[in-house]
Design a protein with these regions (language model features):
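Extracytoplasmic
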Residues: 23-58, 79, 261-266
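Extracytoplasmic gate region of multi-pass secondary transporters
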Residues: 39-50, 236-295
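Helix-to-loop junctions at the C-terminal end of transmembrane segments
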Residues: 75-87, 294-306, 390-391
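C-terminal ends and interior cores of transmembrane alpha-helices
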Residues: 97-110, 317-328
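Hydrophobic core of transmembrane alpha-helices in multi-pass small-molecule transporters
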Residues: 113-129, 332-346
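Intracellular juxtamembrane helix-capping segments at the cytosolic ends
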Residues: 128-142, 346-359
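A late C-terminal transmembrane helix in Major Facilitator Superfamily
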Residues: 161, 358-393
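C-terminal transmembrane helical hairpin of 12-TM major facilitator-type secondary transporters
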Residues: 285-297, 302-354
Length: 424
């Protein structure tokens, strides 16, 4: 190990990212806000309003969301190839503009077929710019501070959970749902223009150092020079790599547990705890707000302990939190709600951090695309697992504890594989 490496603490928690680094982080927060807000949480408002506006069946509209997500999931794997061919920044801008146009078309759909096609386009392009491209830019800018940066950027997901339905409702009251989605689509296009002006794909292009640290820059330059002649990992190579599969499955188990718990949280508070709908929704909002702190906190744990150890602790935290949530005493329920909120905040942090840890800046795009596909396939099984469990048992205890165990298994899977780092 060189003297440079001996004198640098790669696990140090630091927020000295510089103006341009914080600009990158700010854009990614907003990008993840739109991803979660429009493709997940916003559907609570969009679907019933679109159905009422057009006289369509809301159940039919909602049923389109699942195949749209699956189609987008496989389409997003291909974005790594586009990034290699067109460049990371250009791909980001193009997908943002296409997402904005798709949102405008979505809001102004004249029939269900147009609704379905535009929704597939939205999910595909938003996931492309927020995850495939956005996380790749962050991996380039913050190669050793990935944990804390992912913790900060994923706050955007929780902001969306807390705010998007208020934003959509407010805009719809003035402009109808078609106008609301058109305005938000225009905002995404404006965001693409601003990104084109203020953000570079790598810190070197912006005249900055990775992690805003010249010592880190020297280490990375030496590491990347050592593998310069090696070919970049291919799709086939990534899909043969054990880290891609194990990390994709492990993170997928976290996502499966999160969707399984969150999808029944409102009904749990109403049926098992006696809350009215307004009170149950308030508990959901509280969990989302706590999740903002959780995003940052799990980023700190990731940075200090390493991503794989953080994943194991996350799985255990999830298990204990769910156990408290469903325990009969009311104080236990509040402890569980706090822990669950912290868990949903950290849920989005780990997969891009794991990809950056193992594959570094050079091979992040393809490896993350493949990991994310595996993660998405596992996560999409959540409703099937929930349906099977609910058909076998009554109440919420058994399904909740099964999801809690699944979260622990995810953490064990990730920590069980030998730690590998692109930057030592």
């Amino acid at each position: 190990m060189s003297e440079n490496k001996k004198n640098v603490d790669l696990n140090k928690v630091s927020y000295n990212f510089g103006t341009k680094g914080w600009t990158v982080i700010g854009f990614e927060i907003v990008m993840l806000f739109f991803m979660t807000g429009i493709t997940v949480d916003g559907l609570n408002t969009i679907v019933p309003m679109m159905a009422a506006f057009h006289g369509w069946n809301p159940d039919v509209l909602l049923s389109i969301s699942t195949p749209a997500s699956i189609i987008a999931l496989f389409a997003c794997v291909l974005w790594a190839a586009f990034i290699e061919k067109a460049g990371l920044k250009k791909t980001t801008i193009i997908t943002m503009v296409l997402a904005g146009i798709s949102m405008i078309a979505y809001g102004n759909s004249v029939n269900i077929a147009m609704y379905a096609v535009s929704l597939v386009c939205i999910v595909t392009f938003i996931n492309a710019f927020a995850c495939n491209c956005g996380f790749a830019i962050c991996a380039n800018w913050f190669p050793t501070k990935k944990g804390i940066v992912m913790g900060i950027t994923t706050i955007g997901m929780n902001l969306a959970s807390a705010l998007i339905n208020w934003i959509l409702s407010g805009l719809s009251n003035s402009f109808q749902i078609s106008g609301a989605l058109s305005i938000l689509g225009g905002v995404v296009i404006l965001l693409a223009i601003l990104l084109g002006i203020f953000v570079k794909a790598t810190p070197e292009e912006a005249g900055c150092y990775p992690d805003n640290d010249p010592e880190i820059a020297a280490i990375i330059k030496a590491e990347e020079e050592g593998v310069k002649e090696m070919e970049k990992v291919s799709y086939a190579g990534a899909l043969k790599n054990k880290y891609v599969w194990i990390f994709g499955l492990g993170a997928g188990f976290f996502g499966l547990a999160t969707v399984g718990i969150m999808s029944q949280l409102v009904s749990y508070f109403m049926a098992a705890r006696g809350y009215e709908l307004t009170g149950a929704l308030s508990m959901l909002t509280i969990a989302a707000v706590i999740g903002m702190i959780g995003s940052w906190a799990w980023g700190v744990v990731d940075q200090k302990l390493g991503t794989q150890k953080a994943c194991l602790l996350f799985g255990i935290w999830y298990f204990v939190g769910i156990a408290f949530l469903i325990a009969p005493p009311t104080p236990c329920m509040y402890i569980g709600l706090f822990m669950l909120g912290g868990a949903i905040g950290g849920n989005g942090n780990f997969l891009p951090s794991l990809a950056a840890q193992v594959f570094g800046r050079k091979d992040f795009n393809v490896s993350y695309a493949c990991m994310n596909m595996i993660n998405g396939i596992v996560r999409s099984c959540s409703f099937f697992v929930l349906a099977v469990l609910r058909s076998m048992t009554s109440g919420y205890t058994v399904p909740s504890m099964v999801f809690a165990v699944i979260a622990v298994i995810g953490g064990i899977l990730i920590v069980a594989v030998k730690e590998k780092k692109a930057i030592q």
